[in-house]
Amino acid sequence: MCIRDREDYLSTPASNAVWSLGYGSASLQTGDELDGKHYVGGSLSFPKSKAATAIYDDQRVRVIAINDGSGRGTLIFAVIDGFGISSTDVRGIRKELADFAKANNIVGINISVLHQHSCVDTFGMNGDLVKMIFTNPALNRINNTFGTDYKLLNGQNASFMKHLYDVTVDSVKEAVNSMTTGKMYYSEIEAGEYIRDKREPMVFDSKIHRFRFVPDNGTKETWLCNMAIHAVGNGAAGTEITGDYPYYIEQEVNKAGANFIQIQGAELAISSKHDSLNLPEGTPRLESLKIYGTTLGKLIVESNEAETEVAPLLNYRMKEYYVPVTNQILEFAGKLGALTNTVVATDDSNNVLEVATELGYLEIGTKLAVAIIPGELEPAIAYGGYLDADHSWTGTDFDYPSLQDIVGTDKELLVFGLMNDQIGYILEDNDYSSILSGVNEEIVATGNLAGSTTINAFEELMKSIH
């Protein structure tokens, strides 16, 4: 499963291979979310911070442990309800699981978010910016002068994050300890009437990709659903805590007797579309996101799309890479200490910053490939269809292959986005506009080189495998 060199790669299942899968889940909530010290992630807020004022439903972590029976180890996928999680916290959780991983031959621990704009801030950018602006520079000077390690202020609540670490670790262990053999089935459910793209070139995946694991022992099934839809049903500026539409998909899947886990796809500017729901005018946002999630849940549960059995085969490899920070807003946030990402200076005067992050490649069975991406990917980078010089912001072409081109035509490409880091929007270089344009995607992107840098790193990774 974990490809350390070309000899580890399997093109067909090992002899006597069989799927094994386990599931774990827990609430991230502590009961203290309304104490005025828990901020809601989703948008920068200045000068007033976004302290949580109400709890509408739950904020959870969901985990699967999966093994292809080849003897090459077990993979973990943990998905957190939250706006983002940085590589710093991903590595922190991995560190707490190090002994358990070694004892159980876990070869990869992947942690992502569903990117709700309405959960307690797990990323750090949505705290009290006024306090950060005035306090963190002084703390930086003290740390640099005296060699101290005072923690800089950000939007994370320390107690909440400790609880998040604890229950995520426990849920990983629960998933591993509950692994059982079974069969895996895959189907594609058309959901285009519920999805819209807000940005040219209007390329997006309209499918819900469902993996249905059926245990041999007759216990509860586990359904993994991969789809690309922003979870921003309550807007980006609200102060109510909600798990948004994924929470209500889960309610329907649970009613059908199955466990549920969702992984976001390439959802850069992909959002929900409510036209076919026929909602009365003035329907409150919290009610509309509930109806939207329930509708998607019923669509998934009631689907009669043909399923194919997935051969028990996983090939998996990760690669670290560095993304230049050319966005002045994020550069300022990095120097301020508001970013929890691993940001490194690559010059002596600390003026050139890069985010150290990781991407990966996964094969599930013999016909499906997955790009594991550390941010919110423009779908055209995954599937092709870039804007040409006549239609792009810079007036130039973007002469790069898509990730599907790099993978080849013999496998369908899926995207597991926001995985192991949140580096923001990953756009084509030729369509990254000025942050003064007011385009939201540019404000929360590392800059104008994220697209080409990510494509190059993915291509290098694929060359190391094949």
Write out the residue ranges for each language-model feature.
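Conserved beta-alpha junction segments in alpha/beta enzyme cores
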Residues: 4-291, 297, 304-466
